[in-house]
A protein has these predicted regions:
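Soluble catalytic domains of enzymes that build or remodel membrane lipids, polysaccharides, and related
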Residues: 4-6, 34, 98
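Glycine-centered tight beta-turn/hairpin loop motif at sheet-sheet or coil-to-beta transitions
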Residues: 1-2, 18, 39
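Active-site beta-strand termini and strand-to-loop segments that position acidic
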Residues: 35-38, 125, 145
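CN hydrolase (nitrilase-like) catalytic-core segments centered on the catalytic cysteine
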Residues: 41, 47-140
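Short hydrophobic alpha-helix segments
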Residues: 1, 5-7, 133
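A short, polar/charged loop-to-alpha-helix boundary motif
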Residues: 9-24, 137-155
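Short Gly/Pro-enriched turn/cap motifs at secondary-structure boundaries
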Residues: 23-26, 110-112
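Cysteine/selenocysteine-centered motifs that mediate thiol-based redox chemistry or coordinate metal-sulfur cofactors
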Residues: 30-62, 150-174
Length: 174
């Protein structure tokens, strides 16, 4: 293949003891690029980014049809959100989402951090999970998607057309 570009994780977490990403990484500054592949217009939204709906919308408005969200997320509060946020984001933006999470533990921090819960899945633009991997096994999830569904859902719901960006100024203020 060839190099298409890069995305840098936009939101850096500091949410749990022993989880110090903010000490090692700076927030990304490249915006929300979409990459034209031979098969799909692809967006990337990394791990903790998924908790911020604005980025999903920016990727969709930039033309993404399929957005991948690679993650390394452990059990606890985020498991419920894992099952909720990405289907809701797919439906709100008329995109497919590949929700990718690792499995197992990371030594020597396993006792402190817990277990990564896998459960990767592919969700369609209607917010329905079409394929899902298991909680604890290393797996390769392969699934064929129907890109016509992106246009169909966007044409039906018209969420982009009916946005009221004139009223959303507060969303971009600090």
């Amino acid at each position: 293949g060839s190099y298409l570009g890069k995305y840098r994780k936009t939101h850096i977490p500091q949410v749990a003891p022993g989880f110090y990403e903010k000490y090692f990484f700076k927030p990304g500054n490249l915006g929300y690029p979409v990459f034209d592949t031979a098969y799909v217009k692809l967006g990337v939204y990394i791990c903790y980014d998924r908790h911020f709906p604005e980025g999903w919308r920016a990727l969709a408005l930039n033309g993404a049809e399929y957005i991948v969200n690679p993650s390394a997320t452990v059990a606890g509060l985020s498991k419920y959100l894992w099952e909720l946020e990405q289907p809701a984001s797919a439906a709100a933006n008329g995109v497919f989402i590949g929700a990718i999470n690792r499995v197992g533990t990371e030594e020597p921090w396993a006792k402190q951090m817990g277990e990564f819960y896998g459960s990767s899945y592919i969700v369609n633009p209607r917010g329905q999970i079409e394929a899902q991997a298991s909680y604890g096994d290393d797996e390769l999830l392969v699934h064929e998607i129907d890109l016509d569904m992106v246009r169909e859902v966007r044409d039906t719901w018209q969420f982009f057309r009916d946005r009221r960006s004139d009223l959303y100024g507060r969303l971009t203020e600090k």
